């Protein structure tokens, strides 16, 4: 639960106007892969949680959303794609380079954009992997303002392989944002 997405509302005052801003803190891109693979409808995931938080914030009539990815070291690539679909109507989210050098777009969205209001994404030097993919997609599609320091710069896709006494992690691809190479 410490890694689960959380929301709060803040009020920002400007001369002659105040703004209600929803802040979603996302410490990790998580997904219950076991429940998902068993086709359990109510599996836990960051994209499902953020979708519910966005619905609540829309009902609360916020003027904009801040998505806080500071300290988020990444997680599920599938969740980065699923979360991007909530904000970006269509287009590829990221490109991956295979070991043979071929580049393939991943995460082509064709879904309904759940939130189309103003968005700001906060990043820092600890924002890595899936965080960088999401922030890069927002940058590519000019979907929101990216604020903070340079991110970690991971740029690789990894896969876990189960062994009889643990797991081994393989780096199998490099990732690039879609419109500009990292």
Language model features with spans:
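Conserved small/polar residues in nucleotide/adenosyl-binding loops
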Residues: 181-182
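Cleft-lining beta-strand/loop regions that shape enzyme active-site pockets
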Residues: 1-164
């Amino acid at each position: 639960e410490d890694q689960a997405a959380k929301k709060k509302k803040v009020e920002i005052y400007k001369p002659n106007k105040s703004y209600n801003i929803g802040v979603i803190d996302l410490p990790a891109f998580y997904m219950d892969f076991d429940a998902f693979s068993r086709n359990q409808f109510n599996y836990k995931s960051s994209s499902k949680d953020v979708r519910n938080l966005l619905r609540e914030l829309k009902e609360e009539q916020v003027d904009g959303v801040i998505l806080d990815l500071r300290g988020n070291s990444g997680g599920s690539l599938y969740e980065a794609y699923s979360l991007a679909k909530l904000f970006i109507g269509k287009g590829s989210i990221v490109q991956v380079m295979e070991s043979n050098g071929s580049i393939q777009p991943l995460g082509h969205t064709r879904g309904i954009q759940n939130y189309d209001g103003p968005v700001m994404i906060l990043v820092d030097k600890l924002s890595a992997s899936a965080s960088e993919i999401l922030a890069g997609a927002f940058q590519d599609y000019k979907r929101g303002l990216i604020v903070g320091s340079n991110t970690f710069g991971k740029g690789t896709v990894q896969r876990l392989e189960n062994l009889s006494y643990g797991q081994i992690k393989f780096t199998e691809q490099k990732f690039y944002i879609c419109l500009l190479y990292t």
